[in-house]
UniProtKB/Swiss-Prot annotation:
<dbReference type="InterPro" id="IPR013785">
    <property type="entry name" value="Aldolase_TIM"/>
</dbReference>
<dbReference type="InterPro" id="IPR006063">
    <property type="entry name" value="HisA_bact_arch"/>
</dbReference>
<dbReference type="Pfam" id="PF00977">
    <property type="entry name" value="His_biosynth"/>
</dbReference>
<keyword id="KW-0028">Amino-acid biosynthesis</keyword>
<feature type="active site" description="Proton acceptor">
    <location>
        <position position="8"/>
    </location>
</feature>
<dbReference type="InterPro" id="IPR006062">
    <property type="entry name" value="His_biosynth"/>
</dbReference>
<dbReference type="GO" id="GO:0000105">
    <property type="term" value="P:L-histidine biosynthetic process"/>
</dbReference>
<keyword id="KW-0413">Isomerase</keyword>
<comment type="similarity">
    <text>Belongs to the HisA/HisF family.</text>
</comment>
<dbReference type="InterPro" id="IPR011060">
    <property type="entry name" value="RibuloseP-bd_barrel"/>
</dbReference>
<protein>
    <recommendedName>
        <fullName>1-(5-phosphoribosyl)-5-[(5-phosphoribosylamino)methylideneamino] imidazole-4-carboxamide isomerase</fullName>
        <ecNumber>5.3.1.16</ecNumber>
    </recommendedName>
</protein>
<keyword id="KW-0963">Cytoplasm</keyword>
<keyword id="KW-0368">Histidine biosynthesis</keyword>
<dbReference type="GO" id="GO:0005737">
    <property type="term" value="C:cytoplasm"/>
</dbReference>
<feature type="active site" description="Proton donor">
    <location>
        <position position="129"/>
    </location>
</feature>
<comment type="pathway">
    <text>Amino-acid biosynthesis; L-histidine biosynthesis; L-histidine from 5-phospho-alpha-D-ribose 1-diphosphate: step 4/9.</text>
</comment>
<dbReference type="InterPro" id="IPR023016">
    <property type="entry name" value="Isoase_HisA-like_bact"/>
</dbReference>
């Protein structure tokens, strides 16, 4: 299972929100580039960036920080937040971003998502942020009437490379991921699902492994990495490539 450290950008700084509330933000580092370098050095194979200002404004805001992070790293970076038209998507991909994450337009303009999936195959991921099973939009400030599972199935048909599922009520709470919601969502899809929100300890990651056979093949970790409740290297050893579960047994000769 892939471990994706998260960097949330607000005002050019690395922050974390509590349950998506912009009024409950905590600055963890003034320099997001330095944070990104640290996660790469500790073994991350992909980085997850969210432009919180962009999600609120409806267009990317922290472009300088994003460009600097992409330039500083050798691992791929995926970015979401405020991507609601083709030009903004292409702008980020031209910067060297590996994958872009679409959220609001998946609800408001699904045809555009289909066009982007066709133009940029494998590079379009849809982020589904759910509040009580309904999809939230516009930086989590609004809640639609669309069911998360219904939207995910439609996005798969349109060509999305993966679905990132966030349970807003778990995000930043350190209460553990919503396994039931993830199980239900993944069972309806054939494309990969990436879990996000609530992971607070290695045991949460081990619990997610039970969903890997359904297609939950990645997990985004934010606050727990910044508080030190989870060490990235430990998480990778537990559920990433080369985890102890995957090591073949030693073939000792039989005695006698």
């Amino acid at each position: 299972m892939k471990i994706l450290p998260a960097i949330d950008l607000l005002g050019g700084k690395c922050v974390r929100l509590y349950q998506g509330d912009y009024d409950q933000s905590q600055v963890y580092h003034e320099d997001p580039v330095e944070v990104a370098r640290q996660w790469q050095a500790q073994g991350a194979s992909r980085l997850h960036l969210v432009d919180l200002d962009g999600a609120k404004e409806g267009q990317p805001v922290n472009l300088t920080a994003i460009a600097n992070i992409v330039e500083a790293l050798t691992i791929p970076v995926q970015v979401g937040g405020g991507l609601r038209d083709r030009n903004r998507v292409k702008q980020l991909l031209d910067l060297g971003v590996g994958r872009v994450i679409l959220g609001t337009i998946a609800v408001e303009n699904p045809d555009l998502v289909g066009e982007l999936c066709a133009e940029f195959p494998g590079q379009i991921v849809v982020g589904i942020d759910a509040r009580n099973g309904k999809v939230a939009t516009r930086g989590w400030l609004e809640t639609s009437t669309v069911e998360a599972g219904e939207l995910a199935q439609r996005m798969e048909k349109l060509g999305a490379a993966a679905i990132i599922y966030t349970d807003i009520h778990r995000d930043g709470t350190m209460q553990g991921p919503n396994l039931d919601a993830l199980r239900q969502l993944a069972s309806q899809l054939t494309i990969p699902v990436i879990a996000s929100g609530g992971v607070s300890q290695v045991e949460d990651l081990l619990n997610l492994l039970s969903l890997e056979s359904l297609g939950v093949n990645g997990v985004i970790i934010g606050k727990a990495l910044y508080t030190g409740d989870i060490q990235l290297a430990e998480a990778i050893r537990a559920v990433g490539n080369g985890r102890w579960q995957d090591v073949p047994p030693l073939d000792f000769p039989r005695l006698g």
